[in-house]
Swiss-Prot record:
<comment type="similarity">
    <text>Belongs to the lyase 1 family. Argininosuccinate lyase subfamily.</text>
</comment>
<dbReference type="InterPro" id="IPR000362">
    <property type="entry name" value="Fumarate_lyase_fam"/>
</dbReference>
<dbReference type="GO" id="GO:0004056">
    <property type="term" value="F:argininosuccinate lyase activity"/>
</dbReference>
<comment type="pathway">
    <text>Amino-acid biosynthesis; L-arginine biosynthesis; L-arginine from L-ornithine and carbamoyl phosphate: step 3/3.</text>
</comment>
<keyword id="KW-0456">Lyase</keyword>
<dbReference type="GO" id="GO:0042450">
    <property type="term" value="P:arginine biosynthetic process via ornithine"/>
</dbReference>
<keyword id="KW-0963">Cytoplasm</keyword>
<keyword id="KW-0055">Arginine biosynthesis</keyword>
<dbReference type="GO" id="GO:0006526">
    <property type="term" value="P:L-arginine biosynthetic process"/>
</dbReference>
<dbReference type="InterPro" id="IPR008948">
    <property type="entry name" value="L-Aspartase-like"/>
</dbReference>
<dbReference type="InterPro" id="IPR029419">
    <property type="entry name" value="Arg_succ_lyase_C"/>
</dbReference>
<dbReference type="Pfam" id="PF00206">
    <property type="entry name" value="Lyase_1"/>
</dbReference>
<dbReference type="InterPro" id="IPR022761">
    <property type="entry name" value="Fumarate_lyase_N"/>
</dbReference>
<keyword id="KW-0028">Amino-acid biosynthesis</keyword>
<dbReference type="Pfam" id="PF14698">
    <property type="entry name" value="ASL_C2"/>
</dbReference>
<dbReference type="InterPro" id="IPR009049">
    <property type="entry name" value="Argininosuccinate_lyase"/>
</dbReference>
<dbReference type="InterPro" id="IPR024083">
    <property type="entry name" value="Fumarase/histidase_N"/>
</dbReference>
């Protein structure tokens, strides 16, 4: 029995194992909307150029509308023996309209067809992710406005460093999400060239109009080299790279939420909706949503790495290896989308323990830098000398079992005789935070101004 798709070249059908390893319909069926959209554009162009009749084109477009409706309402039957979404759609089209369906593939290969489908899919997905990232930013900005003056410890090395505000911390992640949106927008701009009409690899002898199909599909224009058109997966790699960075940002916040939820910190409390219990320990409230966001970032990074490895040794133009691009992309982008939804929900609904945050900020000598700065401003000491004196005062306070403001003036003057009682005005966390007025600093007024800028930018 000859193969139905490849015609007379083959005397018998594929081995069962070959059919199984070769089939992609189990995952590329999610291209159905993009595949049908691309086929309609190609069909209309063929008719416009006189390559097929307008009557055949009308039948094809009407038949594709029926196929689309069947897939959307769940009555379409996908067949593994037809390999992929392209042949499943074409086969059903032939059932519906007969021989005219065979004219659709004129001047087209599955190589340029799948590249077109994939670009349309990635473009649609980028648009969806951008909306999710913007919603995530809005959630962060809302919490930043609410907690513009809520003092918490800022950390380096997960050790108390300087007091900051929780609003400032939230806006740090809004900045990260903004860069993520920028990277995805850059990827979208670069991918927005249509490979349709490149055919298998060398172009076609039919008088097609690639500019027409590119315009109908919303591309900026056609790709300029047919070999590159069908072998390019940079647009997937670039999108997955941006996705991996975004997932890494979410993972960092997830890690902080996990830490902050522990009794040792007690900075935040997730709602019951984003936690789980234990089958044996009745007291447990586990931050599983945050932990899963943290874990899914590893999957996204792994999917990017997987696709890079698939592509690294492929000669031009198309190789079947490239069928392995889709599952990695689907998995990564699905994981990022779900992680964004979960993280946005957690940010919107978590409860902030302002007392615990403030108490933690007041411990660990978090105003030591403020003391050093005061020594520079009030006494004219070089910063390095002020830094050394402050370190000695920290050691003295640590030995005494108190914070810096627990040292007496006499004890401070043992280290630096010029210190006056004015020093106590800079040792409180409120004054410390309020003094950080440099652009981008943590002062509450800065945070409120930043919130206004973000609301203008996000339209909220």
């Amino acid at each position: 029995m000859s193969n139905k798709m490849w015609g007379g070249r083959f005397g018998e059908g594929p081995d069962r194992i070959m059919e199984e390893i070769n089939a992609s319909i189990g995952f590329d069926q999610r291209f159905f909307a993009q595949d049908i959209r691309g086929s309609k554009a190609h069909c209309r162009m063929l008719a416009e150029k006189g390559i097929i009749s307008s009557e055949d084109a009308a039948q094809i477009v009407a038949g594709l509308d029926v196929v689309l409706a069947e897939i959307e309402n769940g009555t379409f039957h996908f067949k593994r023996e037809l390999e992929d979404i392209h042949m499943n759609v074409e086969s059903r089209l032939a059932d519906l309209i007969g021989a005219a369906a065979g004219r659709l593939h004129t001047a087209r290969s599955r190589n340029d067809q799948v590249a077109t489908d994939f670009k349309l899919y990635i473009r649609d997905t980028i648009d969806h992710l951008d909306e999710q990232l913007a919603d995530f930013q809005r959630a962060l900005v809302d919490r930043a406005e609410e907690h513009a003056a809520t003092i918490m410890p800022g950390f380096t090395h997960l050790q108390t460093a300087q007091p900051v505000t929780f609003g400032h911390h939230c806006l740090a992640y809004a900045e990260m999400a903004g860069r993520d949106r920028g990277r995805l927008a850059d990827a979208r701009r670069r991918l927005n060239e249509s490979p349709l009409g490149a055919a298998a690899l060398a172009g076609t002898s039919f008088p097609i109009d690639r500019h027409m199909t590119a315009a109908e599909l919303g591309f900026d224009g056609p790709t300029r080299n047919s070999l590159d058109s069908v072998s390019d997966r940079d647009f997937v790699l670039e999108t997955l790279s941006a996705a991996a960075i975004a997932a890494t940002h979410l993972s960092r916040l997830a890690e902080e939420i996990v830490i902050w939820s522990t009794p040792g910190f007690d900075f935040v409390r997730l709602t019951d909706g984003f936690t789980t219990g234990s089958s044996i320990m009745p007291q447990k409230r586990n931050p599983d949503a945050a932990e899963l966001v943290r874990a899914k970032s590893g999957r996204v990074i792994g999917d990017l790495t997987s696709l890079l490895i698939v592509m690294k040794g492929l000669p031009l133009a198309y190789s079947k290896d490239m069928q392995e691009d889709k599952e990695a992309a689907f998995d990564a982008l699905d994981a990022l989308s779900l992680s964004l939804a979960a993280m946005t929900g957690m940010v919107r609904t978590l409860t902030v323990n302002e007392t615990a945050m403030r108490n933690a900020a007041s411990r660990g000598f978090s105003t030591a830098t403020d003391l050093a700065d005061w020594l520079v401003r009030a006494l004219g000491l070089p910063f390095r000398q002020a830094h050394h004196a402050t370190g000695a005062l920290v050691a003295k306070a640590e030995k005494k079992g108190t914070d810096l403001d627990g040292l007496t003036l006499a004890e401070m003057q043992e280290v630096e005789p010029g210190i006056t009682d004015e020093v106590y005005s800079v040792l409180g966390v409120d004054n410390s935070v309020a003094s950080r007025t440099s652009f981008g600093g943590t002062a509450p007024d800065n945070i409120r101004a930043a919130v206004r800028r973000w609301r203008d930018e996000l339209g909220s």
